[in-house]
Amino acid sequence: LYKESCGNCPILESHRTNDLSKKVIARKSKSYAKVPSLTVVGVSKWMAVCAGESSLFSNRKIVNIPNCLDVNLFKPIDKNIVRDLFNIPRNKKVILFGAANPTTDQRKGGKELFESIKLLDLKSVVLVIAGSTRPEKVEDFKYPVYFISPLRDEVSLPMMYNIADVIIVPSLEENLSNSIIESLACGIPVVSFDIGGNSDMIEHKKNGYLSQNISSKDLAKGISWVLEYDNYKKLSSYSREKVLKEFDSKVVAKRYIELYKDVLDGQ
């Protein structure tokens, strides 16, 4: 609906043509018309395309500049040290899944992940669920499950990522996932569905695995591929390299400076 003029907004559960969404988009259209040099930034290629399809921005300049990351904060840390801190076994391969309300928010793909875990045929594996306290009822997995309560500080987050051998981000809706960028910056390959801006960060079978279908079976295939890959160090190194090249705060800041210059030169 945003491609035309809104109304009957599904987010508002509205069935009226002249609802709040229609009034808001009309007001925005009137306001934006007063700024002829308005430039739109989509933080993912997918979002930039969506912006170009909208009635508000179809005739505007649209660029893609991603969110940035402090690569000095999110970086590889010795796994043995951080696993000891979180009481995770040193001698196991760790699958990490984390999100706010990861076991109850359907959009986070918990159902798809748990189904995929049951399909795995791997040895010496544990599952770590971050961002959630242990629920009263725990899924019956063939692998041990550890829970890490929500972490909010910038010191413990990178440490948590570094306990993992692979991080799963099975969200069914994403723009440009902070979790994916942060994981890759720590040198941890990521498995996710090929939706939203995920392909901006994950290069299939170079620093992770992109499942082309919303499929638990393919997600399981991706997890197995990462954990059994014969050159894991290469995956890990390229994960970090990708972030340094495209998402480092210095790199992104330079792109914004160039954009501001272009906008000012065009006025």
Regions found by a protein language model. Give the residues of each.
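A short, active-site helix/loop in glycosyltransferases that binds the activated sugar's phosphate group
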Residues: 17-62, 69-73, 79
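Conserved donor-binding/catalytic core segment of Leloir-type glycosyltransferases
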Residues: 89-108, 114-117
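Nucleotide-activated donor-binding/catalytic signature segment of Leloir-type glycosyltransferases, i.e.
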Residues: 124, 131-159, 163
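Short alpha-helical segment that forms part of, or immediately flanks, the ligand-binding pocket
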Residues: 158, 177, 181-185, 199-200, ...
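Aromatic "clamp/platform" in nucleotide-sugar-dependent glycosyltransferases that forms part
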Residues: 172
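Short hydrophobic beta-strand element within catalytic cores of glycosyltransferases
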Residues: 189-192, 202
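Conserved acidic donor-binding segment of nucleotide-sugar-dependent glycosyltransferases
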Residues: 204-205, 209-216, 225-230
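A short, well-ordered alpha-helix in the C-terminal region of glycosyltransferases
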Residues: 231-246, 255-258
